[in-house]
Design a protein with these regions (language model features):
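Hydrophobic alpha-helical transmembrane segments and their immediately adjacent juxtamembrane loops
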Residues: 240-335
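Peripheral, non-transmembrane regulatory/ligand-interaction domains of membrane transport proteins
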Residues: 2-221, 225-228, 234-237, 241-244, ...
């Protein structure tokens, strides 16, 4: 299983497609190659950025046409769900990014029959990898419907873990920002970037959960007759989990907005402090510059030139002209 995951990551990094076939009759999934044999009685066909040949082979195993990427990306509700001739088609337009948290969002499509599930995706997914690892274990899933429900539960569980992790990171960031220290002020720019990255991840999770929620709602209301009615309880449980995650997402969004406002406020205060210092310096240095300019004139009628202590008097006046504004600023508590 570990070697299969390495092959999957390598193929994805090179932009190659992959077709993995899971069956109850084999201890590990098969990575299909053109011209190769296919394991019997497949339960789950997982396509990752598939080529035309992989699509054609998977469609032959499934006995139904697979959705194109444009079809899975459609945002119209009428294009997301359809059921005909014991073939159920479900699409999630925005599911996972191609490069962790940086790439564009990619869609996810399902084609479900009474005995088999086909999934079409265009990026790696933790929930899919986790389910693939237990497909051949003691609790092996017996039908495509079982695999589909387990995938939905796994997607929600992974989303919950990611939201919890983001919440912990935000708490740590809050402790760093709201600390009266020089280090806290120096990391404000980095904190601003971290808040933006967290907001991006929360938005991604929200988009994925919205797609999953609509799939589950559709199944609760319009599931075909060949889906066991006893499974509706699991559908409702998934929907309940998604509702709880939505509340947590909203709370996390509020905290992120507060953190963003706080960081921008600290940055604004630091800029104001700099402007205040520059203003004080400019005001304090104006009087001595005026005095020095007057006594630096080359007129013969300047009386201070003939004073015995004129130089000391001039220096004293320059220093005094600087001290008076400073004392006044101090009395106003501006310093």
């Amino acid at each position: 299983m570990q070697s299969l995951r390495v092959v999957s990551l390598l193929a994805h990094s090179q932009g190659l497609g992959m077709l993995k076939i899971y069956s109850l009759n084999t201890p590990s999934p098969q990575v299909w190659q053109p011209g190769g044999e296919t394991i019997s009685n497949p339960t789950w066909i997982d396509l990752i950025n598939p080529s035309d040949a992989e699509r054609e082979h998977a469609a032959g195993l499934l006995g139904a046409k697979l959705p194109a990427r444009d079809e899975t990306s459609a945002i119209e509700l009428s294009s997301r769900f359809s059921s005909a001739n014991s073939v159920l088609r479900l699409n999630i337009p925005l599911f996972v990014r191609t490069d962790g948290t940086k790439g564009p969002m990619t869609p996810l499509g399902f084609v479900l029959t009474p005995s088999m599930l086909a999934s079409v995706r265009y990026a790696e997914s933790i929930s899919f990898n986790q389910l693939g690892a237990v497909m051949s274990g003691a609790d092996a899933l017996r039908s495509g419907t079982d695999v589909f429900i387990a995938l939905m539960e796994g997607i929600v569980d992974v989303a919950a873990d990611r939201l919890e992790d983001l919440g912990n990171k935000l708490s740590n960031l809050s402790e760093q920002v709201f600390t009266d220290s020089r280090e806290a002020r120096s990391m404000l720019r980095r904190a601003l970037l971290q808040v933006g990255l967290m907001q991006r991840q929360v938005t991604q999770i929200r988009s994925a959960m919205l797609g999953v929620s609509r799939v589950i709602i559709y199944l609760c209301d319009s599931a075909p007759a060949w889906i066991d009615s006893q499974l509706h309880g699991r559908f409702r449980a998934i929907q309940g989990d998604i509702s709880s995650l939505s509340e947590f997402q909203q709370q996390l969004n509020d905290r992120l907005q507060f953190m963003l406002d706080a960081v921008l406020g600290f940055i604004n205060n630091d800029q104001n402090d700099i402007i205040k210092v520059l203003t004080i310096v400019s005001v304090v240095t104006v009087p001595p510059m005026i005095l020095a300019g007057i006594w630096g004139m080359n007129f013969k009628s300047i009386p201070e030139y003939d004073w015995p202590h004129g130089y000391a008097f001039g220096l004293s006046m320059i220093v005094l002209s600087m001290l008076i504004p400073l004392i006044w600023f101090k009395s106003k508590k501006w310093l």
